[in-house]
Regions:
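Short intrinsically disordered, low-complexity segments
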Residues: 7, 17-19, 169
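Generic secretory/membrane-interface signal
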Residues: 4, 20-21, 104, 365
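Sec/Tat signal peptide C-region and signal peptidase I cleavage site
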Residues: 26-29
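Compositionally biased, low-complexity segments
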Residues: 8-9, 24, 161
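Asp-box/BNR beta-propeller blade signature and adjacent active/binding-site loops
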Residues: 31-429
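Bacterial N-terminal signal peptides
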Residues: 13-24
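N-terminal secretory signal peptides that target proteins for export/translocation
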Residues: 1-9
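In a subset of proteins, long, contiguous C-terminal domains/tails are tracked
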Residues: 5, 19-21, 423, 428-429
Length: 429
């Protein structure tokens, strides 16, 4: 009798525990769902546009390929074009991957895609590079520059090189070597914890300072070693004929030089948290404010964590300090940021989030990047043929003459597989 009573009590206890456990799980899921609904407000009056799509082709990665607009009316965005192929655990792109452009002459409302002549990829993986004889006029009203490196779709030159245009990308000059072509041998890059064999992995990020002066943001990594990219800047004061190292934005980790307090809080266990210099830093977007401050937003990664950070320089790029975390770039390999300034001086940053169902996110800063708003959904109607990989984003961000923002990114829906898309909205409202 006593034994039966004990058994009944045990069964009752287990049943109560299971009910309580189930309730807690359901409540946790509900809270998570509610948090997403509360935190992720939707951008109002956002207009989505197809920039360029092509049957049986995969189009992607504007962040790797650049975007330009000198007047807020005429706009240009680069992207990678390849054959559409279903590939397990990877991007659905195969075949030859070409660097294309799309142009708009009406503030981003309509676009035309084209394969430019004398441009990236037209001269082989490691082209014979030209030496710049006549200095570039960086102040030219229709100047555009495309910087090329390696480790991303359609670009393979570990030395790095560049093209430039004086007619807003209609025609291009290049490929030119970056100075004397010995950047990887600079002592600032050699005397680090990176291996002796490195490669340059820049996208296109530069700040024009005058007719002859330009700061170019670069990244370098140990050859073929994913995640070791670190961000630095170099400067030319003679129209691109020569370049000199300016500073590290995020240097390779050096235990003897690193500030032990500069850790990134990713885990509850403090011992697991990395130093800021131990995390990948690549694919920056840098702007200059009216007061001369340089704000650089960049893609970060450590283990499974992906996020966007902002750093600031108040001495013309000579030194950099951490400013703020811009946002969470989600799962997989994360996403790089795009950054711009509204007419009212508000900073706008966008990035993709590859957590299902897939979103384009936007955040705002009204204090020069010291803090950022809660993220808002710019777009979330993602869909693909297999939905195996949430493959989206890599944005660029241009400002129209009327002050509205134009986000450019790659996207997919069930009806229109991977294509280049734009979203137009008012970043000041």
């Amino acid at each position: 009798m006593k034994t039966n009573l004990i058994i009944r009590l045990k069964i009752s206890s287990i049943a109560c525990f299971m009910i309580l456990f189930f309730f807690c799980i359901q409540n946790s899921i509900a809270q998570t769902r509610s948090a997403k609904e509360i935190n992720y407000q939707r951008v109002e009056n956002a207009e989505h546009i197809v920039v360029y799509q092509e049957e049986d082709k995969f189009l992607g990665w504007p962040a790797n390929n650049g975007a330009w607009s000198a007047d807020g009316v005429n706009m240009l965005v680069g992207f990678t074009r390849g054959d559409y192929e279903l590939i397990i655990d990877n991007h659905n792109i195969g075949g030859n991957q070409e660097s294309w452009l799309a142009r708009s002459s009406d503030m981003g409302q309509t676009w035309e895609g084209f394969n430019p002549d004398n441009y990236v990829g037209d001269f082989g993986k490691e082209p014979e590079l030209k030496t710049l004889v006549n200095p570039i006029d960086f102040s030219h009203p229709q100047f555009a520059m495309r910087v090329v490196g390696t480790s991303y779709h359609g670009s393979f030159d570990a030395r790095g090189h560049f093209f430039f245009s004086y007619d807003a990308g209609k025609t291009w000059n290049g490929p030119y070597r970056l100075g004397d072509n010995t950047i990887r041998e600079w002592p600032e890059l050699k005397n680090t914890s990176l291996s002796s064999e490195t490669e340059l992995t820049p996208r296109t990020d530069y700040v024009v300072k005058g007719k002859d002066e330009c700061i170019v943001f670069m990244s370098v990594r140990t050859k073929s070693e994913f995640g070791t990219d670190r961000l630095f800047s170099m400067r030319t004061v003679d129209g691109g004929k020569t370049f000199k190292f300016v500073s590290w934005v995020i240097p390779p980790y050096d235990e003897e030089k690193a500030d032990p307090s500069a850790k990134i809080k990713l885990y509850e266990d403090e011992a697991l948290n990395p130093h800021a210099d131990q995390s990948r830093a690549v694919m920056s977007k840098t702007i200059i404010l009216e007061n001369g401050k340089l704000i650089s937003a960049m893609r970060r990664r450590y283990n499974e964590h992906n996020w966007v950070d902002a750093y600031v320089s108040e001495d013309d790029g000579n030194t950099w300090t951490f400013l703020s975390e811009v946002g969470d770039a989600g799962a997989g390999n994360g996403n790089p940021p795009a950054l711009n300034i509204t007419d009212k001086g508000r900073l706008v940053a966008i990035f993709g989030n590859r957590v299902e169902p897939g979103t384009m996110m936007v955040v705002y800063s009204d204090d020069e990047g010291s803090s950022w708003s809660n993220p808002q959904i710019l777009r979330d109607d993602y869909g693909s043929e297999d939905m195996e990989t949430i493959d989206l984003g890599y944005p660029q961000l241009l400002k129209r003459k009327d002050g509205k923002m134009v986000a450019l990114y790659y996207w997919s829906t069930k009806e229109s597989l991977h294509h280049i898309a734009a979203t137009i909205w008012d970043g000041d409202n």
